[in-house]
């Protein structure tokens, strides 16, 4: 297992190097001049040129790149032009908000999609099977920002059941003492159940938006994988041996159907990292997605580069976790590693 993990980490290094190079080049190719934005609309050409020199943008591209990689090697992502704060600090402060939203959306999606896919596979052609197909089609068809706007319109504007979509907490509540950065967990640790209730109420709509978006591929893959396994010889043998239907489905069929589902979960999580950007803008969520969008609009290179690199590292770590889960579920993966 350790050998397999070491190999995966070695294979990830070229990918991260490629991400650093491509991100650097793409940010420099974006339209707009950070020096002009930072100087303001009334600045003269001399003032803009002076700021450009101060930011190092007058240097050759290769020199800028080596300076950037040297800073990265020391853990320095640079400073944001719009906030004046270190990018690493901004990302560290905002990442828990994005993580809490993404993880809750994924957990809700898994809790609905996997049982729905299993029921659809064990009852093909029934109403639950048709419900699964309709749900997956709707989840794939609806853009994530449209789903979010519809939920806000229905549950906040029309029905008044949801609080205003303006961040992680209601204005009348203060953040719990920071332990993990996740408000739900920190509020429980502090035994502040009012803050927990407020944080959960703010999370429901954006998490539901992500859950609807991610539910479709998980349910569809669960259904397809279960159908394939249920038609296999060892399942027919288990049924012929007189085992109960629940034992056959859960112990034999579902465990063997899990590998494709786990692969889908890794892809869905990566999709959610991208969809998070739109959801955070719709719900004014103070995560790294909205931070990256604001930096992109203002041609602020450092936050965009820091955001992309953070997402790449998270994706590499996610794939490593998936590989470890493969080894836990299927011993053949450990032997091949």
Which residues make up each language-model segment?
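Short amphipathic alpha-helical coupling elements at transmembrane boundaries
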Residues: 3, 7, 40, 50-53, ...
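Hydrophobic alpha-helical transmembrane segments
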Residues: 41-56, 147-160, 205-210, 247-264
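An internal, D/E-rich "acidic patch" concept
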Residues: 58-114
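Hydrophobic alpha-helical transmembrane segments of membrane transport/permease proteins
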Residues: 15-66, 155-195
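N-terminal signal-anchor/first transmembrane alpha helix
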Residues: 1-60, 88, 92-93, 110, ...
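Hydrophobic alpha-helical segments embedded in or immediately adjacent to the lipid bilayer
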Residues: 115-119, 128-182
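Juxtamembrane/transmembrane-helix interface segments of polytopic membrane transporters
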Residues: 19, 23-27, 148, 152, ...
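Alpha-helical transmembrane segments of integral membrane proteins
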Residues: 2-3, 95-128, 144, 175-337
């Amino acid at each position: 297992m350790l050998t397999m993990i070491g190999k995966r980490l070695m294979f990830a290094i070229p990918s991260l190097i490629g991400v650093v190079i491509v991100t650097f080049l793409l940010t420099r190719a974006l339209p707009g001049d950070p020096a002009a934005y930072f100087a303001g609309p009334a600045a003269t050409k001399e003032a803009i040129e002076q700021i450009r020199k101060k930011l190092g943008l007058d240097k050759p591209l290769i020199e800028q790149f080596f300076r950037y990689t040297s800073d990265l090697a020391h853990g320095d992502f640079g400073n944001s032009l719009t906030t004046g704060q270190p990018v690493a600090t901004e990302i560290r402060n905002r990442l828990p908000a994005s993580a809490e939203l993404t993880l809750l959306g994924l957990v809700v999606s898994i809790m609905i999609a996997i049982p729905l896919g299993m029921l659809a596979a064990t009852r093909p052609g029934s109403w639950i099977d048709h419900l699964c197909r309709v749900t997956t089609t709707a989840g794939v068809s609806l853009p994530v920002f449209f789903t979010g706007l519809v939920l806000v319109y229905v549950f906040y504007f029309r029905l008044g059941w949801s609080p205003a979509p303006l961040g992680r907490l209601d204005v009348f509540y203060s953040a719990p003492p920071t332990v993990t950065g996740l408000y739900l967990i920190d509020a429980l640790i502090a035994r502040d159940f009012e803050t927990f209730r407020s944080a959960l109420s703010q999370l429901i709509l954006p998490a539901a938006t992500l859950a609807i978006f991610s539910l479709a591929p998980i349910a569809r893959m669960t259904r397809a994988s279960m159908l394939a396994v249920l038609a296999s010889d060892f399942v027919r043998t288990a049924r012929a041996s007189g085992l109960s239907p629940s034992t056959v489905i859960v112990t034999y069929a579902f465990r063997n159907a899990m590998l494709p589902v786990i692969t889908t979960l890794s892809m869905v999580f990566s999709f959610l990292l991208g969809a998070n950007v739109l959801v955070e803008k719709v719900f004014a969520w103070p995560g790294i997605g909205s931070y990256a969008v604001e930096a992109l609009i203002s041609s602020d290179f450092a936050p965009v580069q820091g955001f992309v690199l953070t997402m790449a590292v998270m994706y590499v770590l996610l794939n490593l976790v998936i590989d470890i889960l493969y080894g836990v579920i299927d011993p053949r993966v450990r032997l091949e590693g």
